[in-house]
């Protein structure tokens, strides 16, 4: 059965004109034409409390309302097509004419019989320069001081007159001391350090001492409350956590990422596990695969590919790296025992197909790093800085006076010319740290002294070897056994590599034939 074609309904305005009188209009047509939809009601109720007049918010064209669009911060808009607005001045215009400051005299009408010569008259204009300014200076005398009382001493006896003149009092002087300090970021003032001898001030601290003695009567005042000593900024203590931390950033998330990354390498069903004992695996793993020259500027932190012909067999330096085609970059993980493990994933190229594809298994090479033993901490000392107690030495208070007689020379001693005291040995020998060695444990040096054959009287050659040597003369009449060298006889050489039954005669044993020349 064919489905009827849907016919489009007429517009809502035409339907409303025909069905309004009969009262058969659909509800949606009535709401749309009479503006009684939900959206229209929201706008009607909202406009009762909020006024948006002049903004042009409606479904009509965007004209900006009655006043047009007005940019923010400017005056009213200008409509296009209207008559321009005439701007009227705010001030009343003045007439152009002579000023009222200078009077203008009117001239009488000139008659034909009057003379054309105009007499000149001296006129004085207004003085525009300022006049004399009167200056009055008042001098106030300073306060007068009463004269100082001078005491006069008189004497009634007949002695000579002594006049005592008192010094004039010195007026007090005002002294102003200023200090300018510039901030230097590269210089740090040490506010706590031990001063050297003779210093009484250090950095920005000034110590003022008054008096060198004193006596305390009675006991010291006890502390009313318990006081606490605040440590200096140079003294601090490092608290060790319990238990001690194993990593600098103990975050569980980082550990999970490391375990997830290393989980695929430890799968024994898919990857072969090989523990490498050679320490070159950490720094130069390529030297374990093939013999090559080292490049110090190249760091083997990337994946390495080794090109090797499968037809030619090359023995690697390490048998564990046989037929290695690819060796990955290092990966670091943590073992269950807490050690750091360096891992590299390699691939072997054992079998090659006819198409040229090489097939091999995956190998996980790893090496566990050894433990770093922690040594006992060494107490370090600050260089140039000392915190805590400070010692100040005052020279005038703690002085030592030594009475020295200039006429006496303590270094000169009185010894007579023939005194036996000059032969005395005043040095004290101390053998507390000495050791007595008996026997020839020390290695002795052997020197060869050459002897020359001569018919003259005995003369000897002694080599100077920084020591004392005694040369004894020898009797030349005694016979000396001379061992002469053995005659030059050929040596019989036996070659064991010859498996034949015959012997091999050395060329030195063969008979030499002389060549006979034929004379022509």
UniProtKB/Swiss-Prot annotation:
Keywords: Capsid protein, Cytoplasmic inwards viral transport, Disulfide bond, DNA-binding, Host endosome, Host Golgi apparatus, Host nucleus, Host-virus interaction, Late protein, Microtubular inwards viral transport, Phosphoprotein, Viral penetration into host nucleus, Virion, Virus entry into host cell. Its main location: virion. It is found in: Virion; Host nucleus; Host early endosome; Host Golgi apparatus. GO terms for biological process: microtubule-dependent intracellular transport of viral material towards nucleus; symbiont entry into host cell; viral penetration into host nucleus. Residues 139-176 are annotated as: Disordered. InterPro entries: Late_L2. GO terms for molecular function: DNA binding; structural molecule activity. A motif (Nuclear localization signal) lies at residues 1-10, 511-519. Disulfide bonds join 19-25. Residues 151-160 have a biased composition (Polar residues). The keyword Nucleotide-binding does not apply. One of its GO terms (cellular component) is host cell endosome. Highly phosphorylated. The keyword Methyltransferase does not apply. Interacts with major capsid protein L1. Interacts with E2; this interaction inhibits E2 transcriptional activity but not the DNA replication function E2. Interacts with host GADD45GIP1. Interacts with host HSPA8; this interaction is required for L2 nuclear translocation. Interacts with host importins KPNB2 and KPNB3. Forms a complex with importin alpha2-beta1 heterodimers via interaction with the importin alpha2 adapter. Interacts with host DYNLT1; this interaction is essential for virus intracellular transport during entry. Belongs to the papillomaviridae L2 protein family. Minor protein of the capsid that localizes along the inner surface of the virion, within the central cavities beneath the L1 pentamers. Plays a role in capsid stabilization through interaction with the major capsid protein L1. Once the virion enters the host cell, L2 escorts the genomic DNA into the nucleus by promoting escape from the endosomal compartments and traffic through the host Golgi network. This is Minor capsid protein L2. The lineage of its organism: Viruses, Monodnaviria, Shotokuvirae, Cossaviricota, Papovaviricetes.
């Amino acid at each position: 059965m064919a489905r009827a074609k849907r016919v489009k309904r007429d517009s809502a305005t035409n339907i409303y004109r025909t069905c309004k009188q009969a009262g058969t209009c659909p509800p949606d047509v009535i709401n749309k034409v009479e503006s009684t939809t939900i959206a229209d009601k929201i706008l009607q109720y909202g406009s009762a409390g909020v006024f948006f007049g002049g903004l042009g918010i409606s479904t009509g064209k965007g004209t900006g309302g009655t006043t047009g669009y007005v940019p923010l911060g400017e005056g009213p808009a200008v409509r296009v097509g209207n008559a321009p607005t005439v701007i009227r001045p705010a001030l009343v215009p003045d007439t152009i004419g002579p000023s009222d400051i200078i009077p203008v005299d009117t001239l009488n009408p000139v008659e034909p019989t009057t003379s054309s010569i105009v007499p000149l008259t001296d006129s004085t204009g207004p003085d525009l320069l300022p006049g004399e300014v009167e200056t009055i200076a008042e001098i106030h005398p300073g306060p007068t001081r009463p004269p100082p009382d001078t005491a006069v001493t008189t004497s009634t006896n007949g002695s000579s007159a002594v006049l005592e003149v008192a010094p004039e009092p010195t007026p007090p002087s005002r002294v102003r001391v200023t200090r300018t300090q510039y901030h230097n970021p590269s210089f740090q003032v040490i506010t706590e350090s031990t001063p050297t001898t003779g210093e009484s001030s250090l950095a920005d601290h000034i110590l003022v001492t008054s008096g060198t003695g004193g006596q305390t009567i009675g006991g010291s005042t006890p502390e009313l409350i318990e006081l606490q000593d605040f440590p200096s900024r140079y003294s601090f203590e490092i608290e060790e956590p319990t238990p001690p931390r194993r990593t600098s950033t103990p975050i569980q998330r980082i550990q999970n990422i490391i375990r997830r990354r290393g989980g695929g390498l430890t799968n024994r069903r898919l990857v072969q596990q090989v523990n490498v004992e050679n320490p070159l695996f950490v720094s130069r793993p390529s030297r374990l695969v093939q013999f090559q020259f080292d490049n110090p500027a190249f760091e083997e932190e990337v994946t390495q590919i080794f090109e090797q012909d499968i037809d030619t067999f090359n023995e690697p330096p390490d048998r564990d790296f046989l037929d290695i085609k690819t060796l990955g970059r290092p990966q670091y993980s943590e073992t269950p025992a807490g050690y750091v493990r360096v891992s590299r994933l390699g691939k072997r190229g054992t079998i090659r197909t006819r198409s040229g594809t090489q097939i091999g298994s995956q190998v996980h090479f790893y090496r566990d790093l050894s433990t770093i033993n922690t040594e006992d901490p060494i107490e370090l000392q600050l260089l140039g800085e000392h915190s805590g107690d400070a010692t100040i030495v005052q020279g005038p208070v703690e002085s030592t006076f030594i009475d020295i007689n200039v006429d006496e020379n303590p270094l000169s001693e009185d010894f007579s010319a023939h005194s036996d005291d000059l032969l005395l040995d005043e040095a004290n020998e101390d053998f507390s740290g000495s050791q007595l060695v008996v026997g020839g444990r020390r290695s002795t040096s052997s020197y060869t002294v050459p002897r020359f054959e001569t018919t003259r009287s005995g003369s000897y050659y002694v080599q100077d070897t920084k020591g004392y040597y005694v040369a004894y003369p020898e009797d030349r009449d005694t016979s000396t056994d001379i061992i002469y060298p053995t005659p030059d006889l050929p040596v019989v050489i036996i070659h064991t590599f010859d498996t034949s039954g015959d012997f091999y005669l050395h060329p030195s044993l063969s008979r030499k034939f002389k060549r006979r020349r034929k004379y022509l």
